Amino acid sequence: MADACCTRTYVIAASTMSVCSSDVGHVSRVSSPSTCTGSSWQVDNCQESCCEPRSCASSCCTPSCCAPAPCLALVCAPVSCEPSPCQSGCTDSCTPSCCQQSSCQPACCTSSPCQQACCVPVCCKSNCCKPVCCVSICSGASSPCCQQSSCQSACCTFSPCQQACCVPICCKPICCVPVCSGASSLCCQKSSCQPACCTTSCCRPSSSVSLLCRPVCRPACCVPVPSCCVPASSCQPSCCHPASCLSFLCRPACSRLAC
């Protein structure tokens, strides 16, 4: 349709607004063609429904309907498009990646950059500590040979969680002292920390000293040889009596008779 204030004729829709050309360059007033007083007016092509989002072009989130901004100098800039919460059709950056649950922490994931109400935590890496079970070297319920270390026979304490995986605490039982097996000539039983059985004569069990597995074997006291004893005469020593074992030497203490 035509307007008397304009030199040119334009055909516009009924819902179309116009901006007078004299107001272009500053904040334009929205007017109808009949109110334009300048030499010409231009058709405003702004949409009256929802503006096509320009700043909300993310493929992840579906923008909510943007209200049209006032038409300034033929520019239809939508009001700031606030994205709605992420829909199911979001891209990978916003879609929850299946969180593989670890054995020791069911839901210990960290949130993705697209967090808050938008996304579910992304797949988490398990930095869990797994207990390292200690196997006792003792066999049999009656064997008193083994003393457990601080980690005990059930399970070791958790080591601090590392980045890649857990460094197990080395659980080595403290070596124990061989136990004598009665009157057997090979009286020392093997200890797991000693490759061969004790070769010394009848060993008495002793307490474990640090991590060394060395029995303190005390030899039996000296027994006098039959030829050792001579009838008491001419100041000869009487029959030797065994002395108590001092250190590892067993020296007989022979008493002297008066001449």
From Swiss-Prot:
The keyword Transmembrane helix does not apply. Sequence repeats lie at residues 50-54, 60-64, 65-69, 98-102, 108-112, 118-122, 123-127, 133-137, 145-149, 155-159, 165-169, 170-174, 175-179, 187-191, 197-201, 202-206, 221-225, 228-232, 239-243. Coiled coil: none annotated. One of its GO terms (molecular function) is identical protein binding. Restricted to a narrow region of the hair fiber cuticle, lying approximately 20 cell layers above the apex of the dermal papilla of the hair root; not detected in any other tissues. Belongs to the KRTAP type 10 family. Interacts with hair keratins. In the hair cortex, hair keratin intermediate filaments are embedded in an interfilamentous matrix, consisting of hair keratin-associated proteins (KRTAP), which are essential for the formation of a rigid and resistant hair shaft through their extensive disulfide bond cross-linking with abundant cysteine residues of hair keratins. The matrix proteins include the high-sulfur and high-glycine-tyrosine keratins. This is Keratin-associated protein 10-8. It comes from Homo sapiens.
